[in-house]
């Protein structure tokens, strides 16, 4: 009896250790993505970028952290104080929650959830509340317009995100991400589900508010949108949560369409990290290469292009499975 309790205790400690390590690494990577993006954009635009702190600017994150810590943590007197403080915390926590169900390797997974896809869709929908609360609590017209834009964009593209995943779910027969990865042992889903991959990629960028879908934060129109009244640590929480969302979307693309940890020659964790890193590079290069469309064009892309594509993909997948 005591032996079994010791085994359970050791297993719980091991699982908690894995969870803490994964979450800390993801937060650190989310913070470091700012430096990586600035360096890559500088390389793309034929300039130097941040290169003064550390070797080739590698310690720029430390300099940014010191700057943020010593900034005034100001709360506007005309804002709703409780909601204003709560919004970035909700954004940060909701961005981390989706990490719980991602299978990095066959053994490195925090929560092996049988309804992992539904949990991911629920967490992605939760981010709308943080944005709306931030825009409303700021009591600023630009923040409110940005929040309304973000809510409409997120709710619209969540439809296409969910429909693009349904083809993969129908093919593998499960909502469990680990089973979906194991189903891609001989053929990655990106080949039979290429249309679903394209729509998931576009919808994922829209949910992250990544360029060219960053209308809620467009500096030229809204002076940074719902971020406008935030500074210091609270702004950093929004900033890091945006990059964590980008890492989450890249990880889900790898899991759903590129075989997850599976591949030749290298250990599973190295393969997963490499695939995710390459997708993050693609996200950054898209920001460097493409202009920002108008807000009405963003909604048109969703409802008139992505929606028919996802419905066609789901229908064709169902026909192939039935035949």
UniProtKB/Swiss-Prot annotation:
Broad class of enzyme this protein falls into: translocase
Location of the protein in the cell: Cell inner membrane
Membrane topology summary: Multi-pass membrane protein
Enzyme Commission code: 7.1.1.-
PROSITE patterns: COMPLEX1_ND1_2
Keyword Metal-binding annotated: no
Disulfide bonds: none
Keywords assigned by UniProt, alphabetized: Cell inner membrane, Cell membrane, Membrane, NAD, Quinone, Translocase, Transmembrane, Transmembrane helix, Ubiquinone
GO cellular component, one term: plasma membrane
Catalytic reactions of this protein: a quinone + NADH + 5 H(+)(in) = a quinol + NAD(+) + 4 H(+)(out)
Family (UniProt): Belongs to the complex I subunit 1 family.
Listed name of the protein: NADH-quinone oxidoreductase subunit H
Species for this entry: Blochmanniella pennsylvanica (strain BPEN)
């Amino acid at each position: 009896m005591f032996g079994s309790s010791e085994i359970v205790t050791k297993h719980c400690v091991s699982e908690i250790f894995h969870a803490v390590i994964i979450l800390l690494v993801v937060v650190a990577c989310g913070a470091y993505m700012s430096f990586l993006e600035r360096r890559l954009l500088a390389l793309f635009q034929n300039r130097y970028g941040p290169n003064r702190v550390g070797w080739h600017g590698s310690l720029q994150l430390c300099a940014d952290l010191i700057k943020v810590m010593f900034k005034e943590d100001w709360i506007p007197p005309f804002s709703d104080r409780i909601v204003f403080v709560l919004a970035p915390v909700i954004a940060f926590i909701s961005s981390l929650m989706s990490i719980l169900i991602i299978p990095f390797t066959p053994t490195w997974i925090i929560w092996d959830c049988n309804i992992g896809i539904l949990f991911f869709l629920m967490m992605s929908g939760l981010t709308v509340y943080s944005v709306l609360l931030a825009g409303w609590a700021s009591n600023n017209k630009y923040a409110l317009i940005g929040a309304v834009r973000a809510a409409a964009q997120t709710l619209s593209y969540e439809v296409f995100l969910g429909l693009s995943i349904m083809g993969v779910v129908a093919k593998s027969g499960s909502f469990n991400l680990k089973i979906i990865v194991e189903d891609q042992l001989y053929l990655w889903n990106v080949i039979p589900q290429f249309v679903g991959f394209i729509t998931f990629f576009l919808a994922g960028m829209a949910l992250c508010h990544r360029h060219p879908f960053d209308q809620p934060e467009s500096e030229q129109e809204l002076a940074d949108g719902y971020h406008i009244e935030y500074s210091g640590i609270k702004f950093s929480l929004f900033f890091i949560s945006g990059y964590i969302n980008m890492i989450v979307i890249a990880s889900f693309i790898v899991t759903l369409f590129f075989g997850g940890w599976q591949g030749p020659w290298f250990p599973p964790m190295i393969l997963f990290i490499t695939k995710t890193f390459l997708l993050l590079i693609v996200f950054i290069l898209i920001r460097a290469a493409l202009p920002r469309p108008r807000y009405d064009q963003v909604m048109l892309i969703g409802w008139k292009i992505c929606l028919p594509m996802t419905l066609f993909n789901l229908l064709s997948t169902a026909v192939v499975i039935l035949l």
